A protein has these predicted regions:
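Charged, often Cys/His-bearing segments associated with DNA-binding zinc-finger transcription factors
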Residues: 1-119, 148, 152-168, 172-265
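Short conserved beta-strand segments at catalytic cores or DNA/RNA-binding microdomains
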Residues: 121-137, 147, 155-158
Length: 265
């Protein structure tokens, strides 16, 4: 850690962007971890917790619009307007996604990293995603830009949640290559025994391309996102639903909704 501090004082930009990578990977961040494991607070909600969670889960798991969901809930005797449904998804999905990252099963150290595209306010934004060699979700990040800075932020986020990989497979993107190389620069500076093997082989990322399809299938029916923060929150919920579908949690013998609900406990 002394090496990192020294380079930070010298203003090394790549180190400044990644100075906490090894802190998280080596388990030196127990305070943050304990905070993240706290249960989600539903105080002040005007509906029962299970009703809120059912609505959020249904929206992020199935291809429906908010008005569709409003009608579905009304048929079950629950009167709630589409604006409230949107508020629930935006408020609770990111919190549930944080819990999901803390509780997901161990993932493999061989990563596949790529990005796909979504529209927010009529403009394209970029969804960075990483899965392991078995297709298990590692992490994700919505970005308004597709550049080296975004790639660096994503690698930092993914390593924070899933540890340092031994291999990263990317496409021919120069930005993603620079992001992965920045991680190796940090490992060199901090005296790591091994660096990450970086491969640019498109066909090895086919498993991630197939993974993208689930996300696109759900978002296709959402009639577009009006704001970046609501898009990011909704994507977080969709990713959790996809992780449940892929049995990434220890209680995967339970129903998908129960697994989702238990992430809030």
């Amino acid at each position: 850690m002394g090496n990192i501090s020294r380079h930070l004082e010298q203003g090394n930009e790549s180190v400044a962007n990644y100075s906490d990578i090894l802190r998280y990977a080596s388990g030196l961040c127990m305070v943050e971890e304990s905070v993240q494991r706290m249960s989600i607070d539903f105080k002040g909600a005007h509906f029962p917790k299970n009703v809120i969670l059912y609505a959020v889960f249904f929206y992020v798991r199935y291809p429906v619009s908010y008005r569709d969901l409003q009608e579905i809930l009304a048929e079950r005797g629950i009167e709630v307007d589409h604006v409230t449904l949107n508020r629930w998804v935006v408020r609770y999905s990111p919190q549930i996604a944080t819990q999901a990252q803390m509780r997901k099963r161990h993932t493999a150290g061989s990563w596949r990293v790529d990005e796909t595209y979504l529209k927010v306010r009529g403009k394209w934004v970029y969804l960075y995603r990483a899965v392991d060699r078995d297709g298990q979700t590692l992490d994700f990040m919505l970005s308004e830009r597709q550049n080296v800075g975004a790639a660096r932020r994503f690698f930092k986020k993914a390593i924070t949640s899933s540890g340092v990989p031994h291999k990263i497979v990317i496409d021919k993107s120069g930005a993603n290559l620079a992001g992965a190389q920045a991680v190796n620069n940090i490992l060199k500076i901090t005296g790591a025994d091994k660096l990450i093997e970086i491969l640019q082989v498109k066909y090895l990322n086919n498993i991630l391309e197939q993974n993208h399809r689930f996300i696109k299938r759900i978002t296709k029916h959402m009639l577009g996102f009006k704001a970046f923060h609501s898009a990011a929150a909704t994507i977080a919920g969709i990713e959790v639903a996809h992780m449940i579908r892929k049995n990434q949690f220890a209680n995967d013998n339970c129903s998908p909704f129960k697994v989702f609900a238990e992430l809030t406990a």
